[in-house]
Amino acid sequence: MANKREFPLDKTRNIGIMAHIDAGKTTTTERILYYTGKIHKIGETHEGDSQMDWMEEEKERGITITSAATTAQWKDYRINIIDTPGHVDFTIEVERSLRVLDGAVTVLDAQAGVEPQTENVWRQAETYGVPRIVFVNKMDKIGADFDKSVKSLHERLNANAQAVQMPIGSADTFEGVIDLINMVADVYDEDKLGSKWDTIPVPDEYKEEALKRRNELIEAVADVDDGIMDKYLGGEEISNDELKAAIRKATLNLEFFPVYAGSAFKNKGVQMMLDGVVDYLPSPLDVKPYVAHDPKTGDEVELMADDKKPFAALAFKIATDPFVGRLTFIRVYTGSLQSGSYVLNASKNSRERVGRLLQMHANSRTEISEVFSGDIAGAIGLKNTTTGDSLTDPAHPLILESLQVPDPVIQVSVEPKSKADRDKMDVALQKLTEEDPTFRAETNPETGQTLISGMGELHLDIMVERMKREFNVEATIGEPQVAYRETFTKEAKAQGKFVRQSGGKGQYGDVWIEFTPNEEGKGYEFEDAIVGGVVPREFIPSVDQGLQEAMKNGVLAGYPLIDVKAKLYDGSYHEVDSSEAAFKVAASLALRNAASKAGAVILEPIMKVQVTTPEEYLGDVMGSITARRGSMEGMEDRAGAKVINSFVPLSEMFGYATTLRSSTQGRGTFTMVFDHYSPTPKSIQADIIKKRGGEDAE
């Protein structure tokens, strides 16, 4: 007998908490769990005791790495929270959680406003069409500036963000907030850990400013809502309910972003922000239908949240749990699923049995017998399912689009210390690459050396740490290497001819290919322009395949060749001696022959680097960036410090943390985000080729 769902769909919220590292995201999540009754003692990230940060590495580093899914209850709503990491090395976790969320809370540091990683996650949320509210946190800190933070949303993100509250005081005097919709003040009692506050009329000294700001709020809503605009221009009274309904509609349409103020650490303002989550963020019924594909016909199928429809869910995270083993986090889009039943993994076309279903709460769990549309839960027993796989009713297979996985930019070699470590390391790498698609491991067949690659130094440090802690692998780690790429800068035509005719069956393949540079990020494209069968149909896929295989090893220094178009336009064949293998080799020869004419260059990853430093060290810091081949993009003031925005090649950033610490006496900080690939200067290209024993394409 099927269970009934506990919370109706319109009372369900699936939200993520997104932020730059150190904006106070984990503390904010903690407080949500505390006030919604899930935690009895508050944990602080900087003391290494937070409910959400449940992996050992996170406890040590005080940063959130794995998006733990947690269920909480606020008033009569269920809120599922996906805790997303704020560190740039873990953007796959953020992308992954944005895929399964319906709405998000963006947390800003009131001193800093919008920071580089805020820009990153904001852009990702735009890509996935996720409505957001903003929580300006750390209002208790010296230098906190609510208005400047709101302004940074306009200036740096071009967002129509407007305060729905104004803070009462700031830094030491921050004591609560004024609600600009209902025009009341919520003032906190210092002694009651934020669980008690008084709602009072707006104090006289704030009345004039509050009315001015309420008017600004109405004007901002009127810009995106015709009904409010008509009333506003006509001088009619706008009721609180009308204003809230208009804000909800505009927020769901991504035209408006309500902004709240508070201090999670000092337990102020979190409950009002939770009211914002239920008032303005979408339920699964409010979001656009999720588009899936029928694997048989390729037709698009729209998935509406409905328990009666066939089951369809996305596996968005695999975790290795110390208590239950392999845990698959799923988001149910439609239908329902009982524990013990079978599902079809439509991505791999294999049947899997769901043993148990768990509702997750940071690192504790409750077993449940059934999940419904809109739910987020952990499933045990799915052996072959990996991140991004579609799980569906066996009678109704559907493919939900998979996640876009960025390529790694950095790699290091790992050498196990003993034969026993080698075996353990193989198991560890298999599990870790399953969990995280941006982490790759490969063994060089010639040298036997294992290389791991990822999104940054911190990313790889943490993976090595996990191998040691979870799998007892002792290994030596090499120097970090940059993931260079190669590309063509000019058009070139080249012949590739492979002939072996010495008794017996020979080999014959002959092709003419035109290579042209492709747009950045477009990758490799193949065009078949053969007329009159000069290269027979059956050999054309081999030419394409031969090119792709040859491109993996590049033409200059063995790095993958990217962003190139290849047009096969002529060639010849031999009735007897031509084969798929011969045409594969011919294609690779054409690529090699084109290299010198096509202006082959080595590309290097360029990082967007933001350095924050006290003014007295500014000269040293700027000098150091220039010395690292950096280009300045601009500078701004922030809370008594200078913030330098620049672009620097990744190869020049190794060891920068130590340099910055010593040149600013530990007071400077920096963040870096991969931005684009760019050709290396000639002298550096020559060095790279020399080191790799490649050939110069002069």
Curated annotation (Swiss-Prot):
Molecular function per GO: GTP binding; GTPase activity; translation elongation factor activity
tr-type G domain span: 10-285
Disulfide bond entries: none
SUPFAM superfamilies in UniProt: EF-G C-terminal domain-like (SSF54980), P-loop containing nucleoside triphosphate hydrolases (SSF52540), Ribosomal protein S5 domain 2-like (SSF54211), Translation proteins (SSF50447)
Keyword Metal-binding belongs to the record: no
A GO cellular-component term linked to this record: cytoplasm
Chief localization: cytoplasm
GO biological process: ribosome disassembly
Keywords: Cytoplasm, Elongation factor, GTP-binding, Nucleotide-binding, Protein biosynthesis
HAMAP family recorded: EF_G_EF_2_B (MF_00054_B)
Name of this chain's protein: Elongation factor G
Lineage: Bacteria, Bacillati, Bacillota, Bacilli, Lactobacillales
